């Protein structure tokens, strides 16, 4: 046994897949803890299907998860590191995975993770994944940080496990609590301010204005450049995350993958009462048009996610009036 799954009512096939994912996750945690002692896990080794640079650990993780799922109920394996869906067999399930999220942080000892999503297998490989996120059986992640933890939803709340290093087992913890209605934290890469669309600038400017601004309170900004780490913080204490599309070539639809990253995170957030959109529309009801499709992504406390969408609904003149001559880097 690699993870405690009692009393969750999972089908034998899903429970078996979770055991396999947990077993690989525990192994990857051990590999990460020895980075630099035997090999450089952050060394560049090529590019993936989306054109992003691959690190050694990206490939190690992808190979490990793929191998572990052979012989399971997973018929189709879709990975951010693979060009196409890999057919593993004739099982009843399909699994999408970002084997190693946040790999730019490998060499600086910042939390990284694995994001995964389980669907019922459809009639063919791509059809199993180009579908609404509401059809997920499970969505979750493993975070490799000061603790190695696994967080997953099967559609009823969000469950939480922590890796017991001595036993090599993910121990069940109390479920994640519903997200708070209000928050004083937001996460966005402010260095891209000049490229953002006006509604995003307006929203952030109003937060930065603090107690004297239209929100009437002070906010703190966070940015880790690891989606798993950002998600874990928001699940633990609330907040809102924004990765908008912007004016730069290749960033028009943001940089996060709909299938491998955004759909499973949105599934988690929805199951603790939060919201997840592309800035305007619900991520979970959207249909990706290709495996490696990207999407802008806003998620977290429902009220803040709804407010971002409201800023997009305003005409440009109205949005400008909200913050007048203010800007993130102007008084």
UniProtKB/Swiss-Prot annotation:
* Record-linked InterPro entries: FBPase_C_dom, FBPase_class-1, FBPase_N, FBPtase, Fructose_bisphosphatase_AS
**Which coenzymes or cofactors are required?**
Mg(2+)
Pathways per UniProt: Carbohydrate biosynthesis; gluconeogenesis
Gene3D superfamilies per record: 3.40.190.80, Fructose-1,6-Bisphosphatase, subunit A, domain 1
> EC number(s) for this protein?
3.1.3.11
Listed under catalytic activity are: beta-D-fructose 1,6-bisphosphate + H2O = beta-D-fructose 6-phosphate + phosphate
Instruction: Detail which positions bind Mg(2+) 2.
Output: 98, 101, 261
Q: Where in the cell is it found?
A: Cytoplasm
- Give the residues the record marks as binding Mg(2+) 1: 80, 98, 100
Recorded hits in Pfam families, A to Z, give: FBPase, FBPase_C
The family line of this record is: Belongs to the FBPase class 1 family.
Q: Subunit composition?
A: Homotetramer.
Protein name, as recorded = Fructose-1,6-bisphosphatase class 1 2
Tell me the organism's taxonomic lineage.
Bacteria, Pseudomonadati, Pseudomonadota, Alphaproteobacteria, Rhodobacterales
């Amino acid at each position: 046994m690699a993870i405690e799954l009692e009393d969750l009512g999972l089908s034998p096939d899903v429970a078996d897949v979770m055991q396999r994912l947990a077993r690989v996750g525990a192994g990857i945690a051990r590999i990460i803890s020895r980075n630099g002692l035997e090999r450089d896990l952050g060394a560049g080794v090529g590019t993936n299907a989306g054109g992003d640079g691959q690190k050694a650990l990206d490939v190690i993780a992808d190979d490990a998860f793929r191998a572990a799922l052979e012989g399971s109920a997973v018929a189709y394996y879709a990975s951010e590191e693979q060009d196409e869906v890999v057919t593993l067999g004739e099982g009843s399930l399909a699994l999408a995975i970002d084997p190693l999220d946040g790999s730019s942080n490998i060499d600086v000892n910042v939390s990284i993770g694995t994001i995964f999503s389980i669907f019922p297998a459809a009639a063919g490989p791509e059809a199993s994944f180009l579908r609404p996120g509401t059809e997920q059986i499970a969505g979750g992640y493993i975070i490799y940080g000061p603790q190695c933890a696994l967080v997953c939803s099967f559609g009823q709340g969000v469950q939480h496990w922590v890796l017991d290093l001595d036993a090599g087992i993910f121990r069940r913890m109390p479920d994640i609590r519903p997200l708070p209605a209000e928050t004083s934290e937001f996460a966005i890469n402010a260095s891209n301010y000049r490229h953002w669309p006006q509604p995003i600038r307006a929203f952030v400017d109003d937060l930065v204005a603090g107690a004297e601004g239209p929100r009437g309170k002070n906010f703190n900004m966070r940015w880790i450049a690891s989606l798993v780490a950002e998600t874990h913080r928001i699940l633990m204490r609330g907040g809102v995350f924004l990765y908008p599309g912007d004016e730069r070539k290749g960033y028009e639809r943001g940089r996060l993958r709909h299938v491998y990253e955004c759909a499973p995170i949105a599934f988690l957030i929805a199951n603790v009462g939060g919201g997840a959109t592309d800035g305007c529309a619900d991520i979970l009801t959207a249909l990706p048009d290709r495996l490696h499709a990207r999407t802008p992504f806003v998620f977290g406390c429902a009220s803040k996610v709804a407010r971002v969408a409201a800023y997009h609904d305003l005409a440009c003149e109205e949005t400008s009036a909200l913050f007048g001559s203010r800007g993130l880097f102007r008084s």
